[in-house]
């Protein structure tokens, strides 16, 4: 467990998260308006979204299906009876004057996610609930010093609010939880998890306490928009609370915002309680009844999940837990890997994926779906190395050409005459030349300066333009020099 080092001793983190995940759906939760990102302001607003008198909400069943699927992968209880409630508050970008949410009877309860800890063990983070709710619009304050603008394109978009128990004990655990959750949502297609676009937002409830003591007063940090900022926001807020408590002051229960530039949290407003929102069942919406048949149908439609893939990669392909975890952290990478791994050495493929391909993708700022190298061609490259057709060094050159052009590796090797030299006769001739040209170095080597061996290997590789089989060069050269 990680502690906060105060001036008077150690303190514990107590952290709970609320994740707002925008549901992947072409239309909003209670209207047929589009959910397309970055559309012109107020171009995707129906009469329902704008709260025109007499307009009634109609529930989008696809959003319900997405919530059920999410509940299933969270190993949670799907409530067959749930109710929509009105959460009443006034804000300019909430035209109804209330938000349709689920307070008393949510669609999902009692789930869990296991995350890796710093000790290498798995820790269970309990999920209290997942409920459906509609998003608010967007207030724009930087267009004029005299007024604000309202864009209602986002108003009414379906959200899943996923609420954890306060089981998280460090900023790193919070980050691991969000990464694991985001990956699960992406695998089942219920949310794209793009925090930069705001389709996944994190609120962190943070308190601190002396080791083993009762829970302290919590503060909520709103709308943290990246994994890195989750860590920074929690670290700052926990340290702020420790400093206050050690100075004899009290913690005020409040909502705070994280300033990305200063890496500090600032007061936003005093924390509201549930009573402040005057929740009551929405009279325009019937209770949501979910039959067993639908739950079973959606369960059968779920894809293979990350933890299942990790287990498969370890057993079937012999990968380490660490390497398997890296591959499954992106569904597209896992799909690419599986297509290639069935055609070549999976361990060698994994090494090349993680070191070479990831490096090039990061450099080009693209994802694996935009990569010009097909899984089949990647497998061909690995087989060329396996069969000693090309050396590892030449393979890197071939790989760079493949990445730029999308050409098949065998064609590149043929066009550029890069086939590895494994003919003993040819290599012995080159070795003889190197020995003849470096007689002084040969004498030094034979007098005990073994480190010169690498120099001779380098000379052979230079003469063959790195086409010589390095394993064979080492053997033949050693035989010659030691004779």
Curated annotation (Swiss-Prot):
Disulfide bonds: none annotated. It comes from the Bacteria. This is Aspartyl/glutamyl-tRNA(Asn/Gln) amidotransferase subunit B. It holds the Pfam family GatB_Yqey. One of its GO terms (molecular function) is glutaminyl-tRNA synthase (glutamine-hydrolyzing) activity. GO terms for biological process: glutaminyl-tRNAGln biosynthesis via transamidation; translation. Transmembrane segments: none annotated. It catalyses: L-glutamyl-tRNA(Gln) + L-glutamine + ATP + H2O = L-glutaminyl-tRNA(Gln) + L-glutamate + ADP + phosphate + H(+); L-aspartyl-tRNA(Asn) + L-glutamine + ATP + H2O = L-asparaginyl-tRNA(Asn) + L-glutamate + ADP + phosphate + 2 H(+). Allows the formation of correctly charged Asn-tRNA(Asn) or Gln-tRNA(Gln) through the transamidation of misacylated Asp-tRNA(Asn) or Glu-tRNA(Gln) in organisms which lack either or both of asparaginyl-tRNA or glutaminyl-tRNA synthetases. The reaction takes place in the presence of glutamine and ATP through an activated phospho-Asp-tRNA(Asn) or phospho-Glu-tRNA(Gln). Keywords: ATP-binding, Ligase, Nucleotide-binding, Protein biosynthesis. It comes from Rickettsia prowazekii (strain Madrid E). One of its GO terms (cellular component) is glutamyl-tRNA(Gln) amidotransferase complex. PROSITE patterns: GATB (PS01234). The lineage of its organism: Bacteria, Pseudomonadati, Pseudomonadota, Alphaproteobacteria, Rickettsiales. Heterotrimer of A, B and C subunits. The keyword Cell division does not apply. Its EC number is 6.3.5.-. InterPro entries: Asn/Gln-tRNA_amidoTrfase_suB/E, Asn/Gln-tRNA_Trfase_suB/E_cat, Asn/Gln_amidotransferase, Asn/Gln_tRNA_amidoTrase-B-like, GatB, GatB_C_1, GatB_Yqey_C_2, Gln-tRNA_amidoTrfase_suB_CS. The keyword Cytoplasm does not apply. Belongs to the GatB/GatE family. GatB subfamily.
